[in-house]
């Protein structure tokens, strides 16, 4: 099989297509194809017996190439290498390997040119695009000529196929970018009508439904009743909460207090990421200290970025009032920014403390690993994969207990047995199954905990190799991934037998055999592991086990545990740019506002 570019110059002759070869529903003979072109991914299905000419015809239609446009087709093999398809033989080989490897889809890349000579790359071809997750692609779905894009509809919308309302968390609807047809995500493959490239009339609302309220998800119940606040009945998913005492300044009936930037005093910058700035702020009315995550809307106008913000908000709401997860106070927005007001955890993160201590005593690492395990298990029980466990995201509160933060990488809606496939995470913590391109579930969080526990106990990453820093070829992300996949992890001899055992359990490259991943026993395997033998898990969950380390803090505003490169920054927000605001679709952020009712009750009683 040839793995170098070769020329594909279609002569534009008409091809008589078997209708069963294209845009077919999922059948035993169908193959899902992801075609990457011009920053977009178009998803369609083909018959596995498709001819090379039929494939070229389909690609020409998908990419809207004129008849005289030459182009190059490359499929990506199991090693993420590009292989040119220029003949029926090469197409058959791609399909054969697709079936042999039990792949879920055939990934191809299209370039609107041909190489200048055999062995050269196409114009615009970069090897990095073949690594899963290396760049963001706009994902489209092609069915009967429709080019569907997943959308979240903030206003009332109805499916053109089943006539039912489109609603729910995330992007539940698909919209054709050509004819504007609206359908459910679940219905898009069933659409029989071909796209006309002309806008379709909207499905009219039925008169008898016009006054129906749009279903709204109920706010999550608290993890446990807060002291001095509401008392919960028997703990279960639908426990009733007794109303708290009336606030000192009661609101008008039917209204809910909303917050704005004017309600807060901005004090210091305490963190910064690629999307957001984090500030320490004071709520003027109560003088309570919070952290405020500030995100510029102009940076999240892409659909997938907007989903990331919505996911983080949903997980913040779910996590509120859990002892080991950072909770949400409120959300609000301005024309240019989104604001998350969250708990201020002032003890610093584990990365900050590890840089000063290098390694931790085993009893310290055991305590932190146990509290992290409880937090991860709670998320898993709620159908959430965390996917970004690392030292930076483990905070210490003023007493020394941990709290996980930063939920932007989370995946929601995972039921037992469900999997996902997105390539994401921090490179040093990415699990082997993600690197292999396999579908995965909660197993990736337990792998990351193994990496983090190794770092706490050994003072270094399990994937650090002697002499690697002196060799530029071994300082690349690809080399790190190769080490994670192939190298045997060496446990320091200085660690106890129990510590070595738990590390080997978490760092098993086979997720089916990994500690915490057995379908029946799952979390109980962690609880009963000898490394945690003396841990009282019930007391731990109630925060009644004394932490091994208590951060030194002079006040609730003490920033001694935060890096000075952040705290020394100017705290002011940059002025709004009217031109930038004019280009923001504000409808994408409708309904972002939120107030945590339990925290509100606590504040009102102050």
Curated annotation (Swiss-Prot):
CDD domains: C1_aPKC, PB1_aPKC, STKc_aPKC. One of its GO terms (molecular function) is myosin binding. Residues 533-604 form the AGC-kinase C-terminal domain. The keyword Oxidoreductase does not apply. Keywords: ATP-binding, Cell membrane, Cytoplasm, Kinase, Membrane, Metal-binding, Nucleotide-binding, Phosphoprotein, Serine/threonine-protein kinase, Transferase, Zinc, Zinc-finger. The active site is at residue 388. This is Atypical protein kinase C. The gene is aPKC.
């Amino acid at each position: 099989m040839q793995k170098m570019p070769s020329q594909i110059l279609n002569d534009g002759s008409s091809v008589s297509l078997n209708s069963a070869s294209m845009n077919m529903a999922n059948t035993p003979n169908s193959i899902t194809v992801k075609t990457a072109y011009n920053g977009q991914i178009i998803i369609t299905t083909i018959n596995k017996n498709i001819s090379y000419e039929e494939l070229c015809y389909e690609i020409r239609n998908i990419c809207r190439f004129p008849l005289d446009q030459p182009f190059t087709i490359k499929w990506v093999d199991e090693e993420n290498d590009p292989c040119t398809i220029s003949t029926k033989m090469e197409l058959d080989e791609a399909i054969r390997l697709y079936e042999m490897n039990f792949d879920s889809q055939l990934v191809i890349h299209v370039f609107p040119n041909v190489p200048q000579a055999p062995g050269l790359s196409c114009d615009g071809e970069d090897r990095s695009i073949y690594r899963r997750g290396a760049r963001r692609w706009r994902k489209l779905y092609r069915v009967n000529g429709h080019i569907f894009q997943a959308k979240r509809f903030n206003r009332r919308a109805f499916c053109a196929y089943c006539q039912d309302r489109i609603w729910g968390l995330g992007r539940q609807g698909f919209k054709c970018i050509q004819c504007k047809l609206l359908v459910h995500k679940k219905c898009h493959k069933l659409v029989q009508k071909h796209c006309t490239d002309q806008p379709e009339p909207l499905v009219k609302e039925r008169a008898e439904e016009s006054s129906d309220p749009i279903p709204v998800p109920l706010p999550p119940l608290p993890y446990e009743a807060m002291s001095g606040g509401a008392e919960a009945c028997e703990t279960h998913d639908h426990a009733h909460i007794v109303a708290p005492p009336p606030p000192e300044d009661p609101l008008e009936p039917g209204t809910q207090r909303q917050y704005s930037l004017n309600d807060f005093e901005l004090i210091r910058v305490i963190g910064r990421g690629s999307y957001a700035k984090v500030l320490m702020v004071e709520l003027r009315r109560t003088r309570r200290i919070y952290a405020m995550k500030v995100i510029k809307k102009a940076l999240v106008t892409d659909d997938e970025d907007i989903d990331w913000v919505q996911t983080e908000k949903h997980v913040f709401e779910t996590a509120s009032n859990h002892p080991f997860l950072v909770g949400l106070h409120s959300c609000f927005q301005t024309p240019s920014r989104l604001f998350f007001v969250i708990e201020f955890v002032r003890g610093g993160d584990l990365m900050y403390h590890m840089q000063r201590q290098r390694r931790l005593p085993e009893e310290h690492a055991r305590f932190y690993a146990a509290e992290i395990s409880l937090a991860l298990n709670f998320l898993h029980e709620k159908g959430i994969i965390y996917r970004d466990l690392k030292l930076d995201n483990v905070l210490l509160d003023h007493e020394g207990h941990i709290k996980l933060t930063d939920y932007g990488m989370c995946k929601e809606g995972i039921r037992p047995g469900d999997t996902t496939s997105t390539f994401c995470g921090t490179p040093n913590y990415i699990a082997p199954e993600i690197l292999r391109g396999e579908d995965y579930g909660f197993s990736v969080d337990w792998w990351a905990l193994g990496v983090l526990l190794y770092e706490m106990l050994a003072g270094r990453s399990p994937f650090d190799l002697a002499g690697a820093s002196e060799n530029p070829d071994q300082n690349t992300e690809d080399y790190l991934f190769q080490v994670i996949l192939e190298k045997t992890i060496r446990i320091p001899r200085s660690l106890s037998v129990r510590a070595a055992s738990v590390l080997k359990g978490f760092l098993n490259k086979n997720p089916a055999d990994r500690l915490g991943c057995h379908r029946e026993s799952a979390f109980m395997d962690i609880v009963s592991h000898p490394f945690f033998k003396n841990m009282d898990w019930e007391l731990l969950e109630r925060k009644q086990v004394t932490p091994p380390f208590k951060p030194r803090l002079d006040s609730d505003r003490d920033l001694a545990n935060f890096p000075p490169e952040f705290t020394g920054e100017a705290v002011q927000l940059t002025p709004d740019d009217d031109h930038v605001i004019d280009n923001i679709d504000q409808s994408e952020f409708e309904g972002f506002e939120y107030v945590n009712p339990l925290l509100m009750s606590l504040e009102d009683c102050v």
